[in-house]
Amino acid sequence: MPRHPFSPSFLAASVFCAATPALAALQPIAEAPLAGETEFRCQFNADNSTDCVSTYSFTILKPSGREMLSRIDRSYAETDSLIVEKAELTQPGGKPVPLDQSQIDTRTAPNPDQGFLRERQTSLAFPNLRVGPRISYTLREHFTAKPLSTQFHYILSRPPMPVRDDRFVAEFKAERPIFVRSELMDAYRIEQSADKKTLKVSLKKPQYTNYINEAGNAYLRHTPRLELGSSLDLQDNFGPFAARYNEILAAELPKGAAAAVAAVKGKPAREQVAGLMQYINDTYRYLGDWRASERGYVPFSLAEIERNGYGDCKDLAILLAAMLKAAGIKAEPTLVSRGDVVWDLLVPGMYAPNHAIVRAEVDGKTWWLDPTNPVFAPGRTMPDIQQRWALVLGADGKVRRDEIPLEAPGDTLRVTRSEHYTHDGEARVESRVELSNAPLMQLSVADRQRGRTSTDQDLCRNFAKEGSDCVLERDDSQFVLPPSYTISARLTDRRALDRLGGEYFYNRQDLASQWDAFAKYRSEGQLAELYLGEPQITSYDISLSGGKTDEPAHSCEIRSPWFDIDLQAEPAKDGGYHYRYREVQKTSWLNHDEINSAEFGKLIEQSRGCVEQLRLVVKLDKRP
């Protein structure tokens, strides 16, 4: 489902995408590749359509800025329209030169990976671009109303980007009052008329905000954002959709779906849900189809979905809800914003959610079901829809807000491993690994998409620094995941110990890498928030033999709001060593202030020190 009714700039695809996952410090303004000016006016019409006229101007300051403007694309629905009213290039000291019509191309836009779209795409290619010239273009756009939408909703997002913002002015008009909600818009002047039907937004002074060299798992969860809507009421915005969903749900189940419901009849509710999720996974593929019309949030009918054999999120969600209801399980279609990053709900309008799921009540508990996923863990919410708001379309036609909680930490990874060293630093390894939750989901998806042989090769690489003779024992992975899944491995690690001079060392640098990354965040002055994935518990029970170490017993017990760590390590009777390490990750996000706090700094120091205790000098037996 689309998030934005339209983009404020042709640069959205290239610039916005570069700025979403932030990559450390703020880039100096002297390094800005482009200088930009934006001015646009939009009218929200009585029929819920929108008309906009916008002018964008960019001056190329650096060679990289030229590449950003190399080709400018704009895709739009077949039912919408776009006219390039003016496009011109101005060389330094010269006069504006209109862009030749041969450099403006309009064609059918390419389809997405998993769907059909009826979209057009207009592209502009300015000639003779180099450092210094200024390009400018003016667009006139008309956006038709989405099916069943009775309220307008507009999102103006101003994230950091590699463009020096010299001027920004936006004006909005409507035939009914405009409700305004915003966050982090202090750099902008927001003026609204007395009748609330006109709004002007302008940048107070030029600015440049762009992040560089942030971590790979860094994001900006809060950026300057303004949202406009004709109503702040959930029912006003989504009531018509709830009514249509209920009309579809009231229809008789098609033959295949009815047979699937009959097949699980009489089983415990948990097994019925798993059986119906399995049926959808086996029978339907995820594919969005907008060829006939722009459907917006409106699903196909149940009969159409079965006839097609595919559907997008709203199609599969309403089919699952219908089947669950037929099985006697309370189920309601639900709209959410899917992904690692979810915005706060400022205006509950139609562009706030981007995904459809099902809220079900199973054995007295709430399950959040996403039938578009290639795996299903009964009773557990998928990581990309946890910890966020949800708009539930009730059977009574009422729309209500609910909250999807963050899952509590579970035993995600449990490793029992023995390493027996030979005289040359190799080790014979036997390992038993129990997976659940996210790692098990990843394993099942890898088997499905790449095949078991490829997955096994990856697993063997993870069992050793330099492995050979790797033999794995594991069951076939399934769509419906068990509570835990066991992998047994036997192999030789040819580089089990690090050698320095004439000594051999055992270490767990893999356990230290996370704390090294946090320390790097602090020392480099990184700014964004870090996404850690869902809360989890990892534990290791490790036995080392075949050599001797003089390392004494060690223990750690570290407690914090973010992580708990326990270590129990002691010499073994045979001269080897044995330790148990357990780490509990309690949160999915760490923000800038948390990471730079004194308490988190203490956590880094303690955790590094704890892992450092597992650096052992190993004296190997002599060559036989």
Residue ranges: model-predicted function:
Residues 2-23:
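Gram-negative bacterial Sec-dependent N-terminal signal peptides
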